[in-house]
From Swiss-Prot:
InterPro entries in UniProt: HemC (IPR000860), Porphobilin_deaminase_cofac_BS (IPR022419), Porphobilin_deaminase_N (IPR022417), Porphobilinogen_deaminase_C (IPR022418), Porphobilinogen_deaminase_C_sf (IPR036803)
Name of the protein in question: Porphobilinogen deaminase
Family designation: Belongs to the HMBS family.
GO cellular component: cytoplasm
Function: Tetrapolymerization of the monopyrrole PBG into the hydroxymethylbilane pre-uroporphyrinogen in several discrete steps.
Record gene name: hemC
Claim: Oxidoreductase is one of the keywords in the record: no
Keywords, sorted A to Z: Porphyrin biosynthesis, Transferase
Taxonomic lineage from the root: Bacteria, Pseudomonadati, Campylobacterota, Epsilonproteobacteria, Campylobacterales
A Pfam family this chain is assigned to: Porphobil_deam
Gene3D superfamilies: Periplasmic binding protein-like II (3.40.190.10), Porphobilinogen deaminase, C-terminal domain (3.30.160.40)
Additional remark text: The porphobilinogen subunits are added to the dipyrromethane group.
Cofactor field: dipyrromethane
EC number: 2.5.1.61
A GO molecular-function descriptor: hydroxymethylbilane synthase activity
Length: 308
């Protein structure tokens, strides 16, 4: 096989991610790579909060359909946007080395989250972020913020918000930090990220010749950490649009796992932090989810969906 076709969204970040994988493949193999840009449902419907659009795979479905029709061979996703179940004929074949997994406080007026005045307007579409912000500061006004990163930063500069919350990885990949007055990453204890945050997931057609070309992209620590995170979410049957945070942080032979599930308004939540040996990572995400279920996580998520 001497050519691969990547189905990609047309946003600046999606194109950066696809070009990054394109360069990796072309620099490490004899394979030529072509990009095919398209729009997904999540790109087109910009006036509705993601949770209200409903369904999983808002940013992946059209790319998957292109692969299933035989028009493309793979797609590069922010792993946090990738559902835990794949259509028949497609497979998650590689997970890249992770960029910064943290969420960041971004503002033109206030130097830190703690400096926000009472009733400040904070922009985010993520129910996970909304929940964790309101746990800390129930007085904040959390306002839906859609669009690509540049659109969100423009709205911030136009004073629509006192601050916005963004994934650090996207800001770093697009070198946007110098355009921001105040950029402060939350610690992992302050704001637990989404499953897979900071990693790129390579989804491809389930064909051995394609899988063989792509497997060199796999990063062992990324695979271990995101396996824990995705297993946790899969057991809870949670998609990208429910208030679930989970992160596995690897340091040497130790993994710290942080997880949170709750209501979007932050009024009720279940939170835990565990430390395990790297050798024990298999099935740990599922076991931790079982413990959350025994503490009422499924009922909490059902109520969260009704509130969203």
């Amino acid at each position: 096989m001497n050519k691969l076709r990547i189905a990609t969204r047309g946003s600046a970040l999606a194109l950066w991610q696809s070009k990054y994988i394109q360069n990796l493949i072309e620099n490490n193999t004899e394979v030529e790579v072509e990009l095919q840009s398209m729009k997904t449902k999540g790109d087109v419907i910009l006036d509705t909060p993601l949770a209200k659009i409903g369904g999983k795979g808002l940013f992946t479905k059209e790319l998957e359909e292109s692969m299933l029709r035989g028009e493309s061979d793979l797609a590069v996703h922010s792993l946090k946007d990738v559902p835990v179940v794949f259509p028949k004929g497609l497979i998650l074949t590689a997970i890249s080395e992770r960029e910064d997994v943290r969420d960041s406080f971004v503002s033109e007026k206030f130097a830190s989250f703690n400096e926000l005045p009472k009733g400040a307007k904070v922009g985010t579409t993520s129910l996970r972020r909304k929940m964790q912000l309101l746990i800390k500061r129930p007085d904040l006004k959390i306002i839906s913020l859609r669009g690509n990163i540049n659109t969100r930063l423009r709205k911030l500069k136009e004073n629509e918000f006192d601050a916005i919350i963004l994934a650090s990885a996207g800001l770093k990949r697009l070198n946007l930090m110098e355009n921001i007055k105040y950029f402060v990453p939350f610690s992992l204890d302050e704001m637990i990220p989404a499953m897979g945050q900071g990693a790129l997931g390579i989804e491809c057609v389930d064909k051995s010749e394609v899988i063989e070309i792509l497997k060199f992209i796999n990063n062992e620590n990324s695979v271990i950490a995101t396996t824990i995170e995705r297993d946790f979410v899969a057991k809870l049957n949670g998609g990208c649009q429910v208030p679930i945070g989970v992160n596995a942080e690897i340091s040497g032979d130790i993994i710290k796992v942080r997880a949170i599930v709750g209501l979007p308004d932050g009024s009720e939540f279940i939170k835990d932090k565990r430390e395990i040996s790297k050798a024990d990572f298999k099935n740990f995400g599922t076991k931790l989810a079982d413990e959350f279920i025994s503490r009422g996580a499924i009922e909490l998520l059902k109520r969260a969906e009704e509130m969203a």
